[in-house]
UniProtKB/Swiss-Prot annotation:
Pathway: Metabolic intermediate biosynthesis; chorismate biosynthesis; chorismate from D-erythrose 4-phosphate and phosphoenolpyruvate: step 7/7. Homotetramer. This is Chorismate synthase 2, chloroplastic. It comes from Solanum lycopersicum (Tomato). The lineage of its organism: Eukaryota, Viridiplantae, Streptophyta, Embryophyta, Tracheophyta. The keyword Amino-acid biosynthesis applies. Its cofactor is FMNH2. One of its GO terms (biological process) is chorismate biosynthetic process. Keywords: Amino-acid biosynthesis, Aromatic amino acid biosynthesis, Chloroplast, Lyase, Plastid, Transit peptide.
Length: 431
């Protein structure tokens, strides 16, 4: 066996050379070079800038508050979807500033333009670029903030991370970044409506200490018209007036308040979401918590469920008149085991008070001196009313991505019709 090994070649030199008594320096061929020092490790490339969301339906937002404009690029949109600027403009108008006395007085038309990804009113399957110009910037309003950090704002942490920041309007930390999300969310909402008849609605359920009782809203029948009937976007007129009063009270005093947005999703296909790390409620929580000013997220019964026993909290099953498995209650919020069960998805997102306020606050300057700051600029006394379409958009982006995931993994082969719900286009027409 040893003699047979001597005939094999090793690194370009005869293996038999090792037994010839030659010096190590003469064992190698003239063409072979061994390194005399440790090689440098490869440079680690990290692609984690945090500006892209989604796996199959991918959205990248761009732009800053006081730059030339903002927008998004949508990659992975199915071809042949009827799409125009008007589909997005409806949602952008709901998000737009300057709508009422309880929002920022900044005047922007937020008119969007699709510059790629469509032809003859249909998507082509290639990336869709949507742009919205900024037209009402006032950079001088931020002169003091270039020197001193706004308490509870991203000013300081952006400096801590990058060592530089865009002062005017807060740059990427501004809520104007969400224009791209809302535009992309409009596309996602249209896909969901056309494909499965899925309807996403959000509304304001709390402003400061004004809390809308849950039993005053029937999530089965509440409509967009009811939500949009007042400037605070609360479907109950009585509580809407109370919420508007709470915002007006702090607005005239240069202060701000927070609140809660409730979001429901009707006609959700069963089977969306995957176990363990990519559970549907986990994806929804991440999406909603990525919005500016968010500080809390509840799903289904949420924290109130901790006061209940298992027998009180469990959603018991029954067979409905269409021979479908349903639940008598919906404390699970439409998701069990990280997977949608076909019931109404129900979640709540908490938003903190706007951090930029016209009241004197103690802070620290960039050169590390304690000082005081009274912030100028045009800011929402309460972000919650304008956050409603933002929450809807992020929920839509999650659900359309999960719809594509479900189709890719579980619908390639014939489904088990006794247990699974086949995914197929809905007969529902979009508005």
């Amino acid at each position: 066996m040893a003699s047979s090994m001597l005939t094999k070649q090793f690194l370009g030199a005869p293996f038999s050379s090792f037994g010839s008594g030659q010096q190590p320096s003469k064992l190698c061929s003239s063409n072979l070079r061994f390194p005399t020092h440790r090689s440098q490790p490869k440079r680690l490339e990290i692609q984690a800038a945090g500006n892209t969301f989604g796996n199959y339906f991918r959205v990248t937002t761009f732009g800053e508050s006081h730059g030339g404009g903002v927008g998004c690029i949508i990659d992975g949109c199915p071809p042949r979807l009827p799409l125009s600027e008007s589909d997005m403009q409806v949602e952008l108008d709901r998000r737009r500033p300057g709508q009422s006395r309880i929002t920022t007085p900044r005047k922007e038309t937020d008119t969007c333009k699709i510059s790629s990804g469509t032809a003859d009113g249909l998507t082509t399957g290639s990336p869709i670029k949507v742009e919205v110009p900024n037209t009402d910037q006032r950079g001088n309003d931020y002169s003091e903030m270039s020197l001193a950090y706004r308490p509870s704002h991203a000013d300081a942490t952006y400096d801590f991370k990058y060592g530089v920041r865009s002062v005017q309007g807060g740059g990427r930390s501004s809520a104007r970044e969400t224009i791209g999300r809302v535009a992309a969310g409009a596309v996602a909402k249209k896909i969901l409506k056309l494909y499965s008849g899925t309807e996403i609605l959000a509304y304001v359920s709390q402003v400061h200490n004004v809390v809308l009782p849950e039993d005053l809203v029937d999530n089965q029948i509440v409509t967009l018209e009811q939500i949009e009937s007042n400037i605070v976007r609360c479907p109950n007129p009585e509580y809407a007036e109370k919420m508007i009063g709470a915002i007006d009270y702090v607005r005239v005093r240069g202060d701000s308040v927070g609140g809660v947005v409730t979001c429901i999703v009707r006609n959700v296909p069963r089977g969306l979401g995957t176990p363990v790390f990519d559970k549907l409620e986990a994806e929804l929580a991440k999406a909603c918590m990525s919005l500016p000013a968010t500080k809390g997220f509840e799903f289904g019964s949420g924290f109130a469920g901790t006061f209940m026993t298992g027998s009180e909290h469990n959603d018991e099953f029954f067979m409905d008149e269409h021979d479908q498995i349903r639940t008598k209650t919906n404390r699970s919020g439409g998701i069990q085991g990280g997977i949608s069960n076909g019931e109404i998805i129900n979640m709540r997102v908490a938003f903190k008070p706007t951090s930029t306020i016209a009241r004197k606050q103690h802070t620290v300057s960039r050169d590390k001196h304690e000082t005081e700051l009274i912030a100028r600029g045009r800011h929402d006394p309460c972000v919650v009313p304008r956050a409603v379409p933002m929450v809807e958009a992020m929920v839509a982006l999650v659900l359309v991505d999960q719809l594509m995931t479900q189709y890719a993994q579980c619908m390639l082969f014939p489904v088990n019709l006794t247990l699974q719900e086949p995914l197929q286009p809905s007969t529902t027409k979009s508005a």
